[in-house]
Every structure is written in structure tokens, then in C-alpha cells.
């Protein structure tokens, strides 16, 4: 495997320094959300201005509380994940991420997807930033690596697909991913493989 390093803009650096404050305070501030969305997808930044400060604090407080109450899982790579645990994992991911208006049961968006500027990839990035041992970041680049070329053209932004993606990171078929010891490291590598940063 050859690793080519590309210089990232400062806003593209994963804002790990925010995690302790967020988890301690129990919510994400508007400024922190801006930094997180800028890291994951600059496309959503302008949309963030459509959220009120109260919405950002309230919706992210639900997420942080949900992560703290959790599943009793501290690391999916270090846990013998039974079908029952995966069902619980999927339900929790679905609850925290939520559903967009067009897919919500009553037409009302839920979870993090209630926030303007937060789509499925950004929602998984929020979970992955705050709980990287349990929730990976899932985006179109990683989808292409894990499910094959063209996979991002199909509907992949669902809790069942997120579960399947996570299971394939926990038990990867790609040799390069098997060598990586952290879930976050594996999802980063999956993105980089598709983007051509890692050559396999």
C-alpha cells in the first residue's frame, strides 16, 4: 500500500478538540456545529444559517444524551457483536440520525436530520466524532470502497445500510482495512481508498 499525503485546509482537520466540551456540556454550540460541518462537507455550511440557536442546542442535546445513555458498547471492534447487539446498534443509530422529511413516518424529520445543513454523511460524522469506537463516518467515498463501484448511486443513506457498512468495517473483506486497529481508522481508510489517496 502506498500512501500519498495531500495537504488539507485547516477547516478540513477533524475537530477532535471539541469533543470533551460537547460531551461535558451536553450539546453542540452553533459555532461547534459550523466547525464540524466545515470539516465534513463545506456544502452544508450555508444551510446551517437556517437553524435557530435553540434548535441546534436542543437537537444536539438529544443526540449527546442518547450517546451517553448509549448501548453499553464502548468499542464495536472489541465486542463480540451478536445479532441482538447489532439490532440495538441499528435502532440507536436510527434514533440519533433520524429520518428526512420524505422518509419520516409522519412526514416530520427526526433526529439530527432535523437540522438544515446536516445530511446523512454529516450526521454520521457527528456520531463518529463524539463516539468513534461505536459509530463510523459514512459518506459516498467510503460507500464506493465498501460496497463497490457505483454503490453511491443507489440509496445508501438508511440505518440498515449504515449498519451493514459498519459490520463490513468491523469484519472487513479488504485486506488493508483488516490491518487497521480502530473503527475510525478503517472508515478514514475506506474514504481514502476511493478518493485515490491510498493505493490498493
Segment roles from a protein language model:
Residues 45-118:
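Helix-hairpin-helix/helix-loop-helix acidic hairpins
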Residues 105-147:
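Catalytic DNA-binding helix-loop module of base-excision-repair DNA glycosylases/AP lyases
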Residues 21-22, 36-39, 66, 70, ...:
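Residues that form generic nucleotide/phosphate-binding pockets
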Amino acid at each position: 500500500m502506498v500512501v500519498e499525503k495531500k495537504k488539507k485546509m485547516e477547516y478540513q482537520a477533524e475537530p477532535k478538540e471539541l469533543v470533551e466540551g460537547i460531551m461535558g456540556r451536553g450539546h453542540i454550540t452553533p459555532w461547534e456545529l459550523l466547525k464540524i460541518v466545515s470539516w465534513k462537507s463545506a456544502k452544508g455550511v450555508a444551510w446551517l444559517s437556517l437553524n435557530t440557536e435553540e434548535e441546534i442546542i436542543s437537537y444536539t442535546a438529544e443526540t449527546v444524551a442518547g450517546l451517553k445513555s448509549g448501548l453499553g458498547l464502548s468499542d464495536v471492534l472489541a465486542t463480540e457483536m451478536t445479532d441482538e447487539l447489532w439490532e440495538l446498534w441499528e435502532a440507536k443509530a436510527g434514533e440519533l440520525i433520524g429520518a428526512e422529511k420524505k422518509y419520516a413516518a409522519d412526514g416530520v424529520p427526526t433526529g439530527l436530520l432535523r437540522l438544515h445543513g446536516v445530511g446523512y454523511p454529516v450526521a454520521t460524522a457527528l456520531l463518529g466524532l463524539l463516539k468513534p469506537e461505536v459509530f463510523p463516518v459514512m459518506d459516498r467515498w467510503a460507500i464506493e470502497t465498501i460496497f463497490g463501484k457505483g454503490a453511491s448511486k443507489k440509496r445508501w443513506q438508511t440505518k440498515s445500510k449504515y449498519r451493514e457498512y459498519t459490520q463490513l468495517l468491523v469484519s472487513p473483506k479488504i485486506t488493508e482495512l483488516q490491518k487497521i486497529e480502530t473503527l475510525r481508522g478503517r472508515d478514514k481508510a475506506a474514504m481514502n481508498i476511493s478518493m485515490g489517496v491510498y493505493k490498493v
